Amino acid sequence: MERGEVYDARLSPTEGSEQQGTCPVVIVSRNAINDNSPVDVIVPLTDAANVKRPYPNNVLIPAAEGGLSMDSMALAGQVRAIAVSRLLRRRGVLSADTMRAIDRALRITLDL
């Protein structure tokens, strides 16, 4: 598993407003960590049509990029670590431009 790859992941159980169920996620942790850790840091994705208020830490990803079937929104405000065993099917890889946008969104979220 590598940074920028999109996977379907089992995110439940969750609480409150956390992204839940099986949904696409993008791996954002560095490859050196991904190669040696039982967990990956991910940003969940959701159907862009479901996002009522886009925040500056959300990133629009057009359909077909990364193997996505619809326009999606990366929710950098919900960045989290998950066990590799939660990752199911690999969908594809996001472009370098999209990953730079996600990096900017993560800097906003984490005040880096």
Positions of predicted regions on the chain:
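Conserved functional hotspots at enzyme active or ligand-binding sites that engage polyanionic ligands
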Residues: 1-112
